[in-house]
Amino acid sequence: MHIDIMTLFPEMFHGVLESSIIGRALAREMITVNLIDIREFSTNKHRKVDDYPYGGGAGMVMKPEPIFYAMDELKKSPSFNVNQKTVFVTPQGNPYSQEKAKELSSLNRLTILCGHYEGVDERVRQHLVDEEISVGDYVLTGGELPAMVILDSVTRLVPGVLGDESSAKTDSFNNYLLEHPQYTRPAIFRGLEVPEILMSGDHKRIATWKTKESLKRTLSRRPDLLDKKSLTEEEYKLMREILKESPNKELDLDRL
């Protein structure tokens, strides 16, 4: 998979690209990442990429020319229009989710445009962007951090990147359930014990415990996810047990 990142601050990505899962994926050539410095496509001798907004208003707006010229350069690649999508990260976009990460990870090529200042000229959004994405209802200085979120979440879903494919499958949100609690050694720390069942060696009981704890945590913290979840027969049975154990929790099981 190839990922283009169009930004005014390419240096912000250096640490991310050299570290952890993304760094290993790049080293093993499972993904390739191209950082495009939008300033390099400015026609202004001072590399200016912003200007005052028409109609007045606070702040500056990213000019269309450098972004269009940068995109023109990307489009020269034969692979650009083959299973490719351009996304713009903005608070006005569609909420980002694990489902969207899965969708983007299936592309051959993903182009991420990072905004800055008060945003970009509307003509960029209308003619260069396929989809606008928001990573949350808050405002950041620029689109670089959201782009890193997308880069990380998409990279880990590329086949072979994690090594153990089950790691991605059991991540929170992967199946509209939050992940079950995790424990490691020591078995007892400051009087706090690991649940005995996890050390029992009984794989069937352990699997049931994990499923039940996952359901319990989702019901407690993100009940909205259960509206999207189709429970298996086992999950339905476990959810009934959970509701009996927690009478203060209300859930219409017939909807699931």
Swiss-Prot record:
S-adenosyl-L-methionine binds at residues 115, 135-140. The gene is trmD. GO terms for molecular function: tRNA (guanine(37)-N1)-methyltransferase activity. Belongs to the RNA methyltransferase TrmD family. Specifically methylates guanosine-37 in various tRNAs. Keywords: Cytoplasm, Methyltransferase, S-adenosyl-L-methionine, Transferase, tRNA processing. This is tRNA (guanine-N(1)-)-methyltransferase. It comes from Natranaerobius thermophilus (strain ATCC BAA-1301 / DSM 18059 / JW/NM-WN-LF). Signal peptide: none annotated. Its main location: cytoplasm. Pfam families: tRNA_m1G_MT. GO terms for biological process: tRNA N1-guanine methylation.
